[in-house]
Amino acid sequence: MSVTIDDVTYIAELARLRFSDDEALKMTDELNTILHYVDTLNEVDTEGVLPLSNIHDQKNVLRADEEHEPIANAAALSNAPDSQDRFFRVPKVLG
């Protein structure tokens, strides 16, 4: 299958696009290059090859979660430059 300049012009009209003659010719060449590549991929023998979603065998490479004791409220507030009651005080950001 190949794309002609008439095909590109027709598709451009459907998409409400405007191409100059040079742009349409370039688009024709680029689309034909893509289609040639797809034809090359279609020639590859994939008989007996299982479909893959990932080329790696690794499933989950993240570390395991480890439970830790939470920091006490008083300890957290002791590191804050300013606090009020049980809360951090920060400068007002919005007007």
From Swiss-Prot:
Classification via InterPro entries: Asp/Glu-ADT_sf_sub_c (IPR036113), GatC (IPR003837)
Superkingdom of origin: Bacteria
Reactions that this protein is recorded to catalyse: L-glutamyl-tRNA(Gln) + L-glutamine + ATP + H2O = L-glutaminyl-tRNA(Gln) + L-glutamate + ADP + phosphate + H(+); L-aspartyl-tRNA(Asn) + L-glutamine + ATP + H2O = L-asparaginyl-tRNA(Asn) + L-glutamate + ADP + phosphate + 2 H(+)
Keyword Membrane: no
Keyword NAD recorded: no
Function noted in UniProt: Allows the formation of correctly charged Asn-tRNA(Asn) or Gln-tRNA(Gln) through the transamidation of misacylated Asp-tRNA(Asn) or Glu-tRNA(Gln) in organisms which lack either or both of asparaginyl-tRNA or glutaminyl-tRNA synthetases. The reaction takes place in the presence of glutamine and ATP through an activated phospho-Asp-tRNA(Asn) or phospho-Glu-tRNA(Gln).
Quaternary assembly: Heterotrimer of A, B and C subunits.
Similarity annotation: Belongs to the GatC family.
Protein name: Aspartyl/glutamyl-tRNA(Asn/Gln) amidotransferase subunit C
Species of provenance: Chlorobium phaeovibrioides (strain DSM 265 / 1930) (Prosthecochloris vibrioformis (strain DSM 265))
UniProt gene name: gatC
